[in-house]
């Protein structure tokens, strides 16, 4: 019975890796389409969202099967519950990747070069967030606590990139009002990448829960207020 359960857990890991791969392709194709203003490629990138949604349903069904048929012990139950939470965030990442490609289509006639918008920051955000998504899934599959925490800490880098990009755009709008609409659209693109980073962080936090039984926020509270926890003021969940 346990061997069968372990095989199904391995299948779950493989399905999560496949979902992560679909998201990676959607983001990479989306940023390529954005930079090159390639509408056809953007339309292809949007199609990944359908595959991501289907993969979410596949994983959800597998998790329910594991819960109903295998009667998992506490540790396994945490792992399956975390996977169910993770795929919700992964599906939202797929949505945001599609949103970025839709913005590319919307801005098809815009002149990036004339607007002097710094596309390097956008490309860096795409690289960072893609890395976060892939590593968060790897952390789950390999039960790698340190890698999950690396992903969480990396979110600050994405936030800093977004803040600097936003300030730069505001300055450009003030200098040239004509570029205001395009700057606003590009800010939305940056915001979508920032949200992808947030969802990758959520995934990493669920990885930590699956390993430790504690959510990252609770672990932080325990470090900050060890006395309160010893006195029973912070309860185990």
Give the location of each predicted region.
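Cytosolic, long alpha-helical scaffolding segments
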Residues: 1-237
């Amino acid at each position: 019975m346990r061997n069968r359960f372990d095989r199904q857990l391995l299948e779950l890991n493989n399905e999560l890796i496949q979902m992560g791969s679909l998201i990676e392709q959607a983001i990479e194709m989306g940023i390529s389409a954005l930079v090159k203003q390639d509408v056809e490629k953007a339309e292809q990138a949007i199609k990944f969202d359908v595959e991501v949604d289907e993969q979410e349903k596949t994983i959800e069904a597998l998790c329910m099967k594991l819960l109903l048929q295998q009667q998992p012990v506490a540790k396994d139950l945490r792992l399956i519950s975390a996977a169910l939470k993770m795929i919700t965030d992964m599906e939202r990442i797929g949505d945001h990747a599609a949103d970025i490609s839709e913005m590319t289509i919307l801005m098809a006639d815009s002149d990036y070069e004339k607007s002097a918008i710094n596309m390097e920051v956008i490309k860096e955000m795409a690289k960072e967030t893609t890395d976060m998504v892939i590593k968060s899934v790897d952390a789950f599959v390999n039960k790698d606590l340190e890698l999950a925490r690396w992903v969480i800490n990396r979110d600050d880098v994405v936030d800093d990139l977004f803040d600097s990009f936003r300030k730069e755009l505001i300055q450009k709008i003030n200098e040239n009002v004509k570029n205001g609409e395009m700057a606003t659209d590009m800010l939305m693109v940056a915001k979508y990448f920032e949200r992808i980073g947030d969802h990758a962080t959520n995934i990493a936090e669920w990885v930590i829960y699956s390993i430790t039984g504690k959510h990252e926020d609770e672990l932080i509270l325990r470090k900050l207020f060890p006395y309160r926890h010893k006195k029973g003021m912070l309860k185990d969940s």
